[in-house]
């Protein structure tokens, strides 16, 4: 079985991939678009991508690619607590440049401003790439923001642990495939994810669409708009619903009512949610 994921090794996505797929073939790709396209082109059986961070919000590239260009289905979700660390070759060295992925830098913005106000921030494709860059340039006064996994991989010192600005920082990862898949991990619940496109000629369309879930007591954990890429002011709505034994019977009727209102519904996935240890 082949699994595509957002690499390189040492990234948070690779931590999830190696935890969930202990004995499968793992293939790292350079971008989210490449990961999803690898699945769509039949190069792998599953694709693993980040979908949302609790601090920085939705990973727009993932949801947009899935909605606009892919027929992939969400078959599982993994939630990984994110622990960012400052890594360098030595704890005693001077730090003039700090490298990392934009989201990692955003998650540690306050810490870096307070402790390294003169350091210049440099962007890399991933946290792991930042750690690798530091490893390969021992003569430069540089550091990386990355996880402890990357520190071990590239033999770097952890200058400071848990430097993220907000406690409880976590990232959701979606596993894309054809059929629902279960894992020997801590299961915390079930979800249904939808993409709704509202009709132009229905006054109060969004309110009416949401109401089909509200009056049935179906819990909605997320709603967010994204551009339809048609014209300004046109959106689709990404919605996550709590799925359980009670809601499992109600959701099909809610979807039927949405269709009756003229709302286009795409089922992105019906899947289990798993909680992983700290990354």
From Swiss-Prot:
> Which keywords are on file for this protein?
Amino-acid biosynthesis, Aromatic amino acid biosynthesis, Lyase, Phenylalanine biosynthesis
InterPro entries the UniProt entry points to: ACT-like_dom_sf (IPR045865), ACT_dom (IPR002912), Preph_deHydtase (IPR001086), Preph_deHydtase_CS (IPR018528)
Q: Name one Pfam family in it.
A: PDT
The annotated pathway is: Amino-acid biosynthesis; L-phenylalanine biosynthesis; phenylpyruvate from prephenate: step 1/1
What's the domain of life for this entry? Answer: Bacteria
Q: What class of enzyme is it?
A: lyase
Instruction: Output the GO biological process annotations, alphabetical, semicolon-separated.
Output: L-phenylalanine biosynthetic process
Entry's EC annotation: 4.2.1.51
Name the CDD domains for this protein: ACT_CM-PDT, PBP2_Sa-PDT_like
Question: Can you name this protein?
Answer: Prephenate dehydratase
Species in which this protein is naturally found: Lactococcus lactis subsp. lactis (strain IL1403)
Q: What gene name is listed for this protein? A: pheA
